[in-house]
Amino acid sequence: MKFIKALPLLMVAGLSLVGCNKAGDVENIKKTGFLNVGITMYEPMDYFDTDGETVIGFDAELANAFAKTLDAEARFIVIKWDSKVLELNSGKIDVIWNGMTITDELKKNIDLTIPYATNYQCVVTKTANIADYTSADSIKDKKVAVESGSAGEAAAEGVTNLNKVTSQEAALLEVKAGTSDCAIIDVTMANSVVGKGDFTGLSTVSADLIAFEKEDFGVGARKGSDLTDKLNVFFKDSYKSGLLTSLSTKYNVAINDATLK
């Protein structure tokens, strides 16, 4: 499968129709031939292949497949996660498609699709220190790295010493470097990268010891956008066709069977 390379946000700003008719997003995408997809580097959802430029992953494959239904091509744009709603509503991107947790706060500002995947937060620390984490109280006095604006930051409520960084990957690197004691990140990402490559020497604390609530992932579109209904139909069709199940197995991502049937 062909994947388009990611573009910096500023390169795309001049190509986007800022302030376009939200109800006509589908028509605009068909005219331009591009679906602008806001992402961060988040393995296994959206991340660079070995060439350092081509975006692959669970969400990337879905975005490519959805774009084809609009006779368009997915164009992946790396954004700052804590600015995702601003980037969407400014028209610089058409959708946020990056393992995004559905929250009541997001619902106030953007439209969200049906839940297509599930997730929960987890604690990651150095393997040598994992015995220090036996309950939720274990992290209260720790220096905890979180991605700014993420579900991990929300889950860290009550922690007094937060180290807010630009991505979940950066949060893990803070732990690896010893500048934070632990990180709170998506288990979806932890299952894919912890203990491997740059994150060798890190381990995930068992959910039996420190548990967080289940979350649902959805794709974000502008309020009133006609993309939302199209995306919901796409997710249900992809479930029926077996595409979602196949990608779930390939990338070890839990899909939301209950809402997709």
Question: Which residue ranges define each predicted feature?
Answer:
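Short helix-initiation/N-cap motifs at beta->coil->alpha
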Residues: 60, 76-87, 131, 148, ...
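Periplasmic-binding protein-like
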Residues: 118-125, 195-236, 254-261
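Extracytoplasmic small-molecule ligand-binding "clamshell" domains
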Residues: 27-99
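C-terminal motif of bacterial Sec signal peptides marking the signal peptidase cleavage site
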Residues: 16-19
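Flexible hinge/capping segments at coil-to-helix
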Residues: 28, 126-143
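A ligand-binding cleft/hinge motif common to bilobed small-molecule-binding domains
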Residues: 100-108, 155, 181-213
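Ligand-binding clefts/hinges and TM-proximal coupling segments of bilobed small-molecule sensing domains
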Residues: 22-24, 151-166, 203-208, 233-261
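Extended ligand-binding regions for polar small-molecule ligands
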Residues: 21, 60-69, 148-150, 214-254
